[in-house]
């Protein structure tokens, strides 16, 4: 059975000067998930948006909202984003004092829980937590800024995650610098969900999403071959 590739536009490139960024919704652009980047100017050197923006967007899209916490600490924000309408929360293990507790807090609220690994973070960080996770986010750029170039070392990490017992995690996703050429290479070793920053800035979002999805699916074809 062919794996389904899902595309997650990132709100980081949305135009917040308008009253409400035009959210992709089911059937209009082909997006599958809305990726919500949260930066605190402590864990990463940038500052973005918080739970109030998530709550304001929630009524305007039926897509699942995946909150990516690039914050330290993690735990105080979990309840706030759960109440704001998040469906998934992903955090960086280096930013949590007790990773298991953070995961348990997320799942107790009925949300999917994920861990994000920076480009230099080893997969061994997952060895004692993977069975409790719903997803793993592989960073193919360093967190904190948009517009960075894809870091190729993400590819062997994705392949290793997709094999053996590590595949117990249901959703392997990649965030950072993903263009159509990268999407093809990422899907082949096992990425299921691709986070794309530039979609909100595209003049034709449906076309931008179709381009990424088509490239990724061509990578799956090469995998099958």
UniProtKB/Swiss-Prot annotation:
Binds 1 divalent metal cation per subunit. Pathway: Carbohydrate degradation. Substrate binds at residues 10, 68, 144-147, 175-177. It comes from Rhodospirillum rubrum. Its EC number is 5.1.3.1. It catalyses: D-ribulose 5-phosphate = D-xylulose 5-phosphate. This is Ribulose-phosphate 3-epimerase. The active site is at 37 (proton acceptor), 175 (proton donor). Belongs to the ribulose-phosphate 3-epimerase family. One of its GO terms (biological process) is pentose catabolic process. GO terms for molecular function: D-ribulose-phosphate 3-epimerase activity; metal ion binding. A divalent metal cation binds at residues 35, 37, 68, 175. Keywords: Calvin cycle, Carbohydrate metabolism, Isomerase, Metal-binding. The keyword tRNA-binding does not apply. NCBIfam families: PRK05581.1-4, rpe. It comes from the Bacteria. HAMAP family: RPE. Catalyzes the reversible epimerization of D-ribulose 5-phosphate to D-xylulose 5-phosphate.
């Amino acid at each position: 059975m062919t794996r389904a590739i899902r595309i997650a536009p990132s709100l980081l490139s949305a135009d917040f000067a308008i009253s409400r960024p035009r959210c992709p919704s089911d059937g209009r652009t082909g997006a599958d998930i809305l990726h919500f980047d949260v930066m605190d100017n402590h864990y990463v050197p940038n500052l973005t948006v918080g739970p109030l923006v998530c709550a304001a967007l929630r009524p305007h899209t039926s897509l699942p909202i995946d909150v990516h916490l690039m914050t330290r600490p993690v735990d105080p924000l979990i309840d706030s984003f759960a109440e704001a309408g998040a469906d998934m929360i992903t955090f960086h293990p280096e930013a949590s004092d007790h990773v298991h507790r953070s995961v348990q807090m997320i799942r107790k609220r009925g949300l999917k829980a994920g861990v994000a690994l920076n480009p230099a973070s080893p997969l061994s960080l997952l060895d004692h937590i993977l069975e409790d996770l719903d997803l793993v986010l592989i960073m193919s750029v360093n967190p904190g800024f948009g517009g960075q170039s894809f870091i190729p070392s993400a590819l062997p990490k994705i392949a290793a995650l997709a094999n053996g017992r590590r595949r117990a995690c249901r959703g392997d996703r990649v965030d950072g610098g993903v263009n159509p050429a990268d999407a093809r290479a990422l899907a082949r070793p096992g990425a299921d969900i691709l986070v794309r920053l530039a979609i909100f800035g595209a003049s034709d979002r449906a076309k931008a999403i179709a381009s990424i999805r088509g490239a990724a699916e061509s990578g799956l074809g090469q995998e099958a071959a």
